Amino acid sequence: IMGFTKPIEHFILQRKKVITMNTLYVGIDVSSKSNVVYLMLPNGDKHSNFSVANSHEGSTQLVKRILSALTSHSLDTVLIGLEATSVYGDNLVYFLREDATLAPFNRKIHVLNPKQVKKFHDAYNDLPKNDYVDSFVIADCLRFGRINKEVYLGDYRYKALQNLTRARFFAVQNLIKEKQRFMNVLFKKYSTMTQEKVFSDTFSTTALAVYDEFDSAEALANMDLHELTDFIIEKGKNRFPDPDAVAKAIQKAARSSYRLPKTVNDSVNQVLSISITSMKALESQIKEFDKAIKAQMELLPNVLISIPGIGPVYSAGIMAEIGDINRFDNQAALAKYAGLAWKQHQSGSFEAEVTRLIPSGNRFLKYYLYEAAFSLVRCDKEYSDFYHLKYKEVNRCQHKRALALTARKFVRLVFRLLKDNRLYVPAK
């Protein structure tokens, strides 16, 4: 193979051969411009390796080479594997699934976790690292069959839903980061207001109006109290039970805040104004994603929406990442796929009491499971009791631990409802 310092046969002879008859293994190392391919015969021997462009024309050449190998060796099954490398492999997978010339053969496509492929690669101590070697390792992973593999979602409705739920995930993360940056800048203008809970919602319409429409902490502190109260009533649409008390709390915080030089204060005001505009735009994006997700969910059966507190958005985020529930043998396999499994730390007679979550897993699925579980805590007594029980068991990382364990419990419910295709019935 190009890039090997030793013949590939050297490495093949160093490992135990696992023979699966009548199967061609295709390892593909995907990049933005090219796809490096390794074709492996059932006994582990090399058939060929080559590179094609990551384009429609290049994929057509790839299929022709696969067909030639299948027919020349009288094989009836082809297993194709590639790593999950951002968006670069999606179009190739669509092409391979839709290509009619491969239809007569038993065709399966697997998108592999790059971390697991790397660990498989590390088992070969003297293998170099390049694209041609990577394609060989991927093909060998498929042949051994002892690596957790993700079969590509065959139902395009799930892929369409996944595009929306993942885009929403990134919009939410951007909003969180923008709010964090906003609070850092707000401290410069109203230092005490960020330290004390003046508003129940730091990012409410009234709060943002106070941050944005007053030039400085000094101007706010010197404003007539009645005028400030009227301002609070107007911006809060007369929903504050005691607007006069709110106005007094705001002025008290403004008086004890630092005073900035005018030049610095002006730049801070500009940053806050732009940040508020960005947050409103992101919130608008999230609402549009929610509408699109709800419309897409009408095309899919959804038993998860029967769970209290789990609306169409959270259920969509979960279902989009799971796809066909039959991909998972049991609820433990689903939990591990979501990264909700704990590492065992044991040696001799020692058994660690504190263990960590595994670092791998589908971060999108984990996010939506966490969000759904926390919503369920607020709406379902059984899950609320479980969360608070786990919360009280420890003195540190209470919420984080309790939420992870609640999400793990929720996985069992999700698996059973999807597996049996039945609605949720609360415990009596």
Task: Give the location of each predicted region.
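A detector of single, family-specific signature residues
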Residues: 1-428
